[in-house]
Regions:
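Residue-identity detector for glycine
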Residues: 32, 47-48, 56, 78, ...
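TPR/TPR-like alpha-solenoid helical repeat scaffolds
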Residues: 121-136, 166-185
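Short, structured coil/loop segments at alpha-helix boundaries
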Residues: 60-62, 75, 95-99, 124, ...
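Alpha-helical adaptor scaffolds
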Residues: 80-153
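Amphipathic alpha-helical binding modules
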Residues: 141-150, 154-167, 175, 179
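Polar alpha-helical coiled-coil and adjacent low-complexity
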Residues: 69-72, 82, 94-97, 171-178, ...
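Alpha-helical junction/boundary sensor with strong preference for TPR arrays
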Residues: 70-73, 107-121, 161-166, 182
């Protein structure tokens, strides 16, 4: 079994927030996600990320360090960069099922964190500064673990943010490829 983070975001009702911090409450039931395989807790709130450590023989020291860096980040940009690093590492190691599962399970945490970061950048009128390779990587990880609908949602979300994945066909082409893979499954 893989120790994967549950994508459950919690709210601290007494926390004071400034413009660069946010708290949200999001659960699998609220998002309609059918994936219930992720059981460990991961939170994103004003105090920072709380990703479940990657445990087991499969988890490299590098991944464990990246999870720790992400958890220790105190601002949205640092949390985003740390989480992107974890997702990128899982993406690179996706031929190993444990990495693929762990990375795919970060989907909702990443989408919520990106939404908050995007809102912050919109308020500061500098959305061009956000780099978001994790949308492409998450869609691939989700596709690889057979969560085709979730992979499609990630691509559609990227299109809503007007992001590109660096390929000729973009997220539109990626959506078509995921739909083909879904039809074959």
């Amino acid at each position: 079994p893989v120790d994967t983070p549950n994508i459950k975001l919690t709210t601290e009702p007494d926390a004071e927030l400034n413009d660069s911090e946010t708290t949200e409450s999001l659960t699998h039931a609220e998002t309609g996600s059918a994936d219930t395989s992720a059981t460990a807790v991961s939170t994103f709130q004003a105090g920072g990320l709380s990703l479940e450590p990657a445990k087991g023989d499969w988890a490299s020291e590098s991944l464990q360090q990246q999870v720790e860096v992400a958890n220790n980040a105190t601002d949205l940009q640092g949390q985003h960069d740390g989480l992107v690093s974890v997702i990128n590492h899982c993406y690179k190691m996706r031929k190993q099922a444990d990495y693929c599962q762990y990375g795919a399970a970060l989907q909702l945490t990443y989408l919520e964190l990106y939404r908050s970061l995007h809102q912050q950048h919109v308020a500061q009128k500098n959305t061009d500064d956000i780099k978001a390779p994790a949308f492409m990587q998450l869609s691939t990880l989700l596709n690889d673990v057979g969560q085709f609908d979730e992979a499609l949602k990630v691509c559609q979300q990227a299109l809503e943010y007007q992001l590109t994945d660096g390929t000729v066909t973009g997220f539109e082409g990626r959506i078509k490829r995921i739909e083909k893979a879904k039809a074959k499954a």
